[in-house]
């Protein structure tokens, strides 16, 4: 699983080449730590021995979070993402979860993909950042 995510992070993260190794290492480390905190199940579709689509179901009591959905661009449009999502929803039901949540960017295509599969928006978040060392005066 980590191989698919690592390829995706290396391809898609908006970070400098100099920082990429450290950022990817931190993300992989985060996944290992998450595995120890909640019940994490990795779900995947393999083709010719290689993971082409994957997601994670994280169960904490009666709530499940579906995260890290990723399909290799060369394997999209073949139903692999649907298979991963369906398996996650089935597993959540088996665990007795009455709620499955996920996050999707309101301006990106996955939001519509999830909506077509029955998910509805229930809230929004606001993401912000500041340059390291910037003061409130210099950030204006």
Protein language model features and the residues they cover:
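Flexible, substrate/cofactor-facing loop regions flanked by secondary structure
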Residues: 1-64
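Ligand-binding pocket scaffold of soluble enzyme catalytic domains
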Residues: 4, 19, 26-27, 31-34, ...
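Accessory recognition modules or surfaces
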Residues: 54, 110, 116, 130-140
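Short acidic/polar active-site loop segments enriched in Thr and Asp
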Residues: 62, 98, 120
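Conserved acetyl-CoA binding element of GNAT-fold acetyltransferases
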Residues: 62-73
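Conserved acetyl-CoA-binding loop-helix of GNAT-fold acetyltransferases
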Residues: 71-73, 77-94, 115-116
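Conserved GNAT acetyl-CoA-binding A-motif
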Residues: 92-105
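Conserved catalytic-core motifs of GNAT/GCN5-like acyltransferases
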Residues: 101-103, 112, 120-134
């Amino acid at each position: 699983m980590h191989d698919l995510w690592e390829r995706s992070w290396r391809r898609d993260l908006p970070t400098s080449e100099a920082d990429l190794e450290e950022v990817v290492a931190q993300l992989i480390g985060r996944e290992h730590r998450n595995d120890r905190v909640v019940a994490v199940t990795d779900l995947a579709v393999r083709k010719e021995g290689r993971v082409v689509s994957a997601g994670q179901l994280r169960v904490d009591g009666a709530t499940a979070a579906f995260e890290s959905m990723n399909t290799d661009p060369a394997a999209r449009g073949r139903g692999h993402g649907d298979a991963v999502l369906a398996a996650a929803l089935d597993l959540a039901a088996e665990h007795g979860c009455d709620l499955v949540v996920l996050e999707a960017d309101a301006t990106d295509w996955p939001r519509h993909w999830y909506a077509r599969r029955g998910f509805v928006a229930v809230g929004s978040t606001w993401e912000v950042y500041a340059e390291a060392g910037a003061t409130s005066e210099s950030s204006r």
